[in-house]
Amino acid sequence: VSWLGDVYKRQDLSKYSYIELKTGFHYYQGFRSPIDAEKEEKGYSLGWLHHKGRNKHHWEYWLDFGVDGIYACKMPTNYVIEMFCDRVAASMIYQKEKYTDSSALEYYENGRGKILIHPETDALIHHLLKYLSEHGLDQTIHYIITEIKE
């Protein structure tokens, strides 16, 4: 499927920038994102601030400021699909042999009430992660290709 190749080619290329590599090398632990360790030490992460502003598959990219303050914009479906792929891959990498098809859903649900995400974006990513937990990765990819992809 050609769109999967497009995702692969552009996915998270900013990770190779100096600021993100520096964060990754300095705070690498192997079981969680180096960004979390940098935030614990500094209270923020320069690597994350750089990363989220350049990668549209992160919900934080879609925050804007209006007359009533900060609000969440609805993410286009293709970026929600990329977010799904990113979350599943991160769960596989950080959880290693403890990974299950419910891992990404559990992680998302753990932080779900603390994020500012558009309700339709939240509903779609939650649906995809729940589908994965119930049907497995192969069926979920097939479902995304046949039923979700615009």
What are these regions (language model features)?
Residues 24, 31-47:
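Acidic, glycine-rich loop-and-strand cores that form catalytic or ligand-binding grooves
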Residues 1-8:
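Short, small-residue-biased leader/transition segments that mark boundaries at the very start
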Residues 13-22, 96:
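Catalytic Zn2+-binding segment of zinc metalloproteases
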Residues 10, 14-15, 89:
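Short active-site segment of divalent metal-dependent hydrolases/proteases
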Residues 27-34, 102-121:
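Divalent-cation-assisted or electrostatically stabilized phosphate/pyrophosphate-binding catalytic cores
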Residues 113-150:
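Charged phosphate-binding loop/patch that engages nucleotide di/tri-phosphates or the phosphate backbone
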Residues 7, 21-25:
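Short secondary-structure boundary/capping segments
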Residues 41, 48-99:
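Alpha-helical scaffolding flanking metal-ion-dependent phosphate/phosphodiester catalytic sites
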